């Protein structure tokens, strides 16, 4: 549907989120009919609050996906550490690998709990801008660190398509 004063000028190609189109939009002399105002008549003047509320849920979504990525990387590292042998035993039995896996599991659990807490509070109708932002920050950084450590546990094999951690 087109509205006077709104134009779509450019589709933006992205590295991820390919299932959701992103476009560049311009608003020139655009007026929103009262029937299209978010929240109906009562929503007039509250657009900023509604937009910020959507950002909170988006941050929880990013945190949730980050926890999923971290979980997959951790599980791949755990499987590999149990299957790969050096010096006649699984690398899982080497203390350095155990320490690394324990650190990964701790970061993963902390990210999961922060994300659950933000989601639970949002579901209860609470304002969660701080909690959602903290969960997004911590979970996304944890996912990067856990994926990096999973690659290190795999060694050179982590860079081959033979193992899922390469993704």
Description of each model-found segment:
Residues 52-53, 146, 154-167:
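Glycine-rich phosphate/cofactor-binding loops in nucleotide/flavin-utilizing enzymes
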Residues 62-72, 103-107, 138-141:
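Amphipathic, heptad-repeat-like alpha-helical segments
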Residues 93, 97, 132-137, 158-167:
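Charge-rich, acidic-biased intrinsically disordered regions
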Residues 1-75, 79, 89:
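FAD-binding core of flavoproteins
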Residues 78-92, 105-138, 151-154:
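C-terminal helix-coil-helix/basic helical segment that borders enzyme active sites and/or dimer interfaces
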Residues 142, 146-149:
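Amphipathic alpha-helical coiled-coil segments
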């Amino acid at each position: 549907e087109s509205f006077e004063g709104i134009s779509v000028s450019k589709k933006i190609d992205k590295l991820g989120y390919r299932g959701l189109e992103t476009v560049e939009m311009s608003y020139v002399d655009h007026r929103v009919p009262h029937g299209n105002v978010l929240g109906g008549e009562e929503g007039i003047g509250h657009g900023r609050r509604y937009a910020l509320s959507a950002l909170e849920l988006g941050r929880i979504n990013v945190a949730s996906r980050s926890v999923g990525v971290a979980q997959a990387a951790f599980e791949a590292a755990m499987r590999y550490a149990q299957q790969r042998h050096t010096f006649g035993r699984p690398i899982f039995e080497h203390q350095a690998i155990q320490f690394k896996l324990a650190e990964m599991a701790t970061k993963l659990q902390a990210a999961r709990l922060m994300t659950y807490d933000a989601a639970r509070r949002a579901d209860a109708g609470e304002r969660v801008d701080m909690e959602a932002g903290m969960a997004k920050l911590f979970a996304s950084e944890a996912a990067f660190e856990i994926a990096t450590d999973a690659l290190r546990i795999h060694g050179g094999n982590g860079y081959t398509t033979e193992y899922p951690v390469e993704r």
